[in-house]
């Protein structure tokens, strides 16, 4: 009897389902992507018991013809590709024809659908076997009901996380698909509670407001750029709105949400030194390219893709974000850290909006009766080690503390805010991305946005007080001089000269055999900044001179730290190594806290700061200065009374 035999269709489908259907969120992803491919404009997801009991996805798409309904549940049956050429020119989210077959192999599935013809069809498939098929009255579109997921593979259930975790993963993937498709209205309900709702009006900022909250949506800036092969656009957060995880960045390639480490690094690189250490921006990055430049058939869930000309795309993305942020005034408002309930009262919001230019006015439509929350949509499994990130939820769901509280809770106040917002935004003229001129990827002077400061005093030997016509400024003297030093050293290191300081006593460095091999392999990186290590035995090196910009008395520590970078990070680019060196030197030579400056030194520092390319942050991303506007000061001293009290400013 032969030992090799062909598996049954049922068993084959169960094996295939192991790759495609990992958890309830996988079912939701596949069904929602099918709805998007069906040109739906409204997609509703209903969940029971975090999807383990029931998942129902309804859409108003084009539906499935009666003759195709049964075929749709066969493996590798699809309407989206036909030839090999189609496989390398995919424009749809799905194309393998595995989703329905894989879901039906491990669940009880009932699908009801109808096209414009008006003839509806219902099919019932359980464990891969068709139980029944009949005509049924149904509107145009498709409803897929999935019950008892993994009923015939109980071992899979043992690896499910808690209901909160599984629900968080469902909300995460639907939220990302909603951000990738702002022209589609999405809802997610869990056990009768609305968890996610987007308007589907094609406004990405409005979609973000429904997912992350109004305050986050308002802190986003739009950007765009293109070259011969790529077009990038989207919304990304200002440097003060960050998270402890990279997963708040959503990358969308030709309408498909993907994960790509190099492109994520490119986005972060666009911020330069504006981000705090360990903090990452939020945003949605849309990338459009010829379908021939992207291979989506490399991962079972299609979450990872291969991109042609990835380095070119990364450079375009970094420069687009860098240029856009260079146009922003990045001085934090000193009152931003006050309690939200005090900060965002209705009348204060109107005052804040009066300061926003029409070009940056967000087109968010707060929805009456809906609590817009600043929620997390990150994949919980990916970020559990970094920071707990609860998913968006209704008050009845105990998924964890929300990152922010709703700005408004009362429907009447929402209505009042909506009226005022519409009045304030009435003069805003929306401009299509295609109609705006492309950004000039070139240096933008920050000095034009830096205030003309007059020095007042020093506080605790740590902070400098200064004023300008628009209010009071408080500067961190260490961060300020660190920024000034950084830009000096970045230029000095970038223009490596032959000027070397010879040591009276050479420095000898001893390393392990493995480290010595690595140092020799990366010696060119060290030499790119003027540091020369000569062999001095099998595992030792000698340094006889060093660049003149090394700080006296710290030569050996500086050299050891630079070598440690190479040993830790491996093959760094020359640019990255020079950047790290400039940051280290600027920090070592900056004045520290509790160091008292005389008036001349303080004024000299304030004069140098506007000359910096980025005077707003130290190289580690901390703010250099904060701003109390005249209005802020008047509010703090109650010189501006609330409108319900007097509406007048005191003399």
Curated annotation (Swiss-Prot):
SUPFAM superfamilies: ATPase domain of HSP90 chaperone/DNA topoisomerase II/histidine kinase, DNA mismatch repair protein MutL, Ribosomal protein S5 domain 2-like
Record's GO cellular component terms: mismatch repair complex
Region: Disordered, residue numbers: 383-405
Keywords per UniProt: DNA damage, DNA repair
Matching Gene3D superfamilies: 3.30.230.10, Histidine kinase-like ATPase, C-terminal domain, MutL, C-terminal domain, dimerisation subdomain, MutL, C-terminal domain, regulatory subdomain
One biological process term in Gene Ontology: mismatch repair
Single GO term (MF): ATP binding
Coiled coil: none
InterPro entries: DNA_mismatch_repair_CS (IPR014762), DNA_mismatch_repair_MutL (IPR020667), DNA_mismatch_S5_2-like (IPR013507), HATPase_C_sf (IPR036890), MutL/Mlh/PMS (IPR002099), MutL/Mlh/Pms-like (IPR038973), MutL_C (IPR014790), MutL_C_dimsub (IPR042120)
DNA repair in keyword set: yes
Purpose of the protein: This protein is involved in the repair of mismatches in DNA. It is required for dam-dependent methyl-directed DNA mismatch repair. May act as a 'molecular matchmaker', a protein that promotes the formation of a stable complex between two or more DNA-binding proteins in an ATP-dependent manner without itself being part of a final effector complex.
Matches recorded under NCBIfam families: mutl, PRK00095.1-3
Family the entry assigns: Belongs to the DNA mismatch repair MutL/HexB family.
Protein name: DNA mismatch repair protein MutL
Organism for this UniProt entry: Lacticaseibacillus paracasei (strain ATCC 334 / BCRC 17002 / CCUG 31169 / CIP 107868 / KCTC 3260 / NRRL B-441)
Name of the coding gene: mutL
């Amino acid at each position: 009897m032969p030992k090799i035999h062909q598996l049954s269709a049922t068993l084959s489908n169960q094996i295939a389902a192991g790759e495609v259907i990992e958890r309830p969120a996988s079912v939701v992803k596949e069904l929602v992507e099918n709805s998007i491919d069906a040109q739906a404009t409204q997609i509703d997801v209903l969940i029971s018991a975090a999807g383990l009991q029931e998942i129902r996805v309804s859409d108003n798409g084009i539906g499935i013809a009666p003759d195709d309904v049964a075929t749709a549940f066969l493996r590798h049956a699809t309407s989206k590709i036909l030839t090999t050429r189609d496989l390398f020119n995919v424009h749809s989210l799905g194309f393998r024809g595995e989703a329905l077959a894989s879901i039906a192999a491990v669940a009880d599935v009932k699908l009801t659908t109808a096209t414009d013809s008006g003839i509806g069809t219902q099919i019932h498939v359980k464990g891969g076997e068709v139980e029944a098929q009949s005509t049924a009255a149904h509107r145009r579109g498709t409803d897929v009901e999935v019950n008892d997921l993994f009923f015939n593979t109980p071992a899979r259930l043992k690896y499910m996380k808690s209901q909160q975790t599984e629900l968080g993963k469902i909300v995460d993937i639907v939220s990302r698909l909603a951000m990738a498709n702002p022209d589609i209205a999405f809802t997610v309900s869990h056990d009768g509670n609305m968890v996610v709702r987007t308007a589907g009006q094609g406004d990405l900022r409005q979609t973000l407001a429904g997912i992350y909250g109004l305050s986050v949506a308002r802190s986003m800036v739009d950007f765009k750029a293109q070259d011969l092969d790529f077009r990038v656009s989207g919304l990304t957060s200002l440097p003060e709105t960050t998270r402890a995880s990279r997963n708040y960045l959503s990358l969308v390639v030709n309408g498909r949400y993907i994960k790509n480490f190099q492109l994520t690094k490119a986005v972060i690189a666009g911020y330069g030194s504006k981000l705090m250490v360990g903090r990452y921006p939020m945003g949605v990055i849309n990338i459009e390219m010829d379908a021939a430049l992207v291979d989506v058939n490399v991962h079972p869930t299609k979450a990872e893709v291969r991109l042609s000309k990835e380095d070119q795309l990364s450079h375009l993305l970094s420069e687009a974000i860098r240029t856009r942020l260079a146009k922003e005034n990045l001085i934090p408002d000193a009152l931003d850290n006050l309690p939200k309930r005090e900060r965002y009262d209705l009348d204060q919001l109107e005052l804040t909006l009066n300061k926003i230019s029409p070009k940056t006015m967000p087109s968010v439509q707060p929805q009456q009766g809906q609590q817009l929350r600043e929620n997390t949509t990150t994949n919980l499994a990916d970020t559990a080690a970094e920071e707990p990130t609860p998913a968006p939820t209704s008050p009845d769901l105990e998924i964890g503390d929300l990152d922010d509280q709703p700005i408004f809770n009362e429907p009447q106040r929402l209505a009042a805010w909506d009226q005022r917002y519409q009045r304030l935004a009435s003069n805003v003229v929306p401009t299509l991305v295609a109609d705006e001129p492309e950004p000039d990827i070139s240096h933008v002077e920050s000095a034009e946005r830096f205030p003309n400061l007059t020095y007042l005093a020093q506080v605790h030997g740590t902070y400098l007080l200064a004023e300008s016509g628009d209010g009071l400024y408080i500067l961190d003297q260490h961060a300020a001089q660190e920024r000034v030093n950084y830009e000096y050293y970045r230029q000095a290191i970038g223009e490596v000269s032959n000027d070397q300081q010879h040591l009276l006593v050479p420095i000898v460095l001893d390393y392990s055999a493995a480290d010595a091999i690595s140092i020799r392999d990366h010696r060119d990186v060290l030499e790119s900044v003027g540091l020369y290590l000569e062999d001095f035995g099998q595992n030792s090196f000698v340094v006889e001179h060093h660049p003149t910009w090394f700080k006296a008395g710290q030569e050996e520590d500086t050299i050891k730290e630079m070598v440690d970078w190479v040993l830790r990070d491996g093959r760094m680019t020359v640019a990255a190594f020079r950047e790290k060196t400039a940051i280290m030197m600027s920090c070592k030579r900056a004045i520290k806290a509790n160091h008292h400056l005389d008036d001349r030194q303080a004024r000299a520092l304030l004069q140098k700061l506007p000359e910096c390319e980025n005077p707003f942050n130290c190289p580690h991303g901390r703010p250099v200065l904060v701003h109390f506007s005249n209005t802020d000061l008047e509010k703090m001293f109650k010189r501006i009374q609330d409108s319900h009290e007097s509406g007048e400013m005191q003399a």
